[in-house]
């Protein structure tokens, strides 16, 4: 936005609990033309579509702050599987067994998979992350959520695991 013009916020449709679509808003970290033709593209670790400011706010996770609105609206929780875009969900439902089970709980700002698996941008990565998401679905509760939140604070404050 400061470097590349365009809006400060980026809003996308995401898939939440029970497959319900909702709008997720983030601070925009990529160029305005990052997805030419409207085709969804997974972001990669060192994505060249990111702006300089975008790389900084992604590394510090500040780009995620506006998602608190989705938590207040009830579309998301603080902890749960990260919500994906409908295009990716459709593909992953076809290619990854049990992928839809992750939608039996609200998506979260942070999750077990984000703490346990490095940043990924492929079907194979989605399969690996799903193992952690399914573990969360089966075992979620107050104590587990608090543990995930505390570990997330460590990641944000000390940069461990930040992309």
Where are these regions (language model features)?
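Intrinsically disordered, low-complexity segments enriched in polar/charged residues with Gly/Pro
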Residues: 1-2, 17, 89-91, 101-102, ...
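A short, structured surface patch at a secondary-structure boundary
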Residues: 43-106, 148-156
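A hydrophobic, helix-centered structural microdomain
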Residues: 1-33, 70, 142-163
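C-terminal terminal-structure detector
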Residues: 94-163
């Amino acid at each position: 936005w400061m470097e590349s013009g365009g809006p400060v916020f980026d809003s996308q449709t995401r898939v939440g609990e029970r497959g319900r679509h909702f709008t997720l808003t983030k601070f925009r970290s990529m160029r305005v033309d990052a997805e030419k033709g409207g085709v969804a593209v997974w972001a990669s670790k060192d994505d060249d579509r990111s702006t300089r400011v975008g790389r900084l706010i992604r590394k510090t996770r500040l780009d995620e702050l506006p998602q608190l609105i989705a938590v207040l609206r009830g579309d998301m929780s603080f902890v749960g599987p990260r919500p994906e875009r409908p295009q990716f969900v459709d593909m992953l439902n076809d290619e990854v067994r049990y992928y839809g089970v992750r939608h039996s709980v609200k998506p979260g700002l942070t999750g077990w998979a984000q703490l346990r698996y490095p940043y990924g941008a492929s079907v194979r990565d989605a399969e690996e992350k799903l193992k952690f998401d399914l573990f969360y679905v089966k075992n979620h509760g107050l104590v587990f959520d608090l543990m995930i939140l505390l570990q997330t604070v460590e990641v944000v404050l000390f940069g461990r695991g930040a992309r």
